Amino acid sequence: MRKELEAIISKGYNSYRVFEDWVGLMFFAFQRDDPHYLEIMGRYRNKGPMGQREADHFANALACLLEYMAATNEEVLGPLYEEYAANHYTGQYFTPLNVARLMAGICQTPPSEGTFTVLDPACGAGACLIAA
C-alpha cells in the first residue's frame, strides 16, 4: 500500500490529499457512486503508461489493503492515516503503537475480580487502550 501511495505522492501531490482521496475512492467504488468517484479522480492527471497512472496506483493500493486484511488481523488504516494524513497537516499527533504497548506493559496490574482499569493518558485515538 505504502509503495502505491508513495508513487502518487512522488508526482507532487499532497500526502494528506492522497490518503483522503484514496479512502474516498474506496468508499465510492464500493457504493458504486460513479459521479463522486469520477469527481475525485478528476483531481489527478492519470497520464502515462498503464500501471503507472494515479488511478492504477490507487487501485493497486486497494488490492494490497484487501490482501493484507485477509492475511492478518492487524489494524492498518489507522497507522496509514497517522503517517499520511495527520501530524503537521492537521495538528494531530499519535502515540506510536510500540510506545503504547510499552506503556500498557508497564502499567498493567493484576486485575481484581470484576474490576478493570483503563489508562489512556491522552484520551485520543485510543492507542493505549488498543495496546492493552
Region annotations inferred by a language model:
Residues M1-A122, C128-A131:
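Class I S-adenosyl-L-methionine
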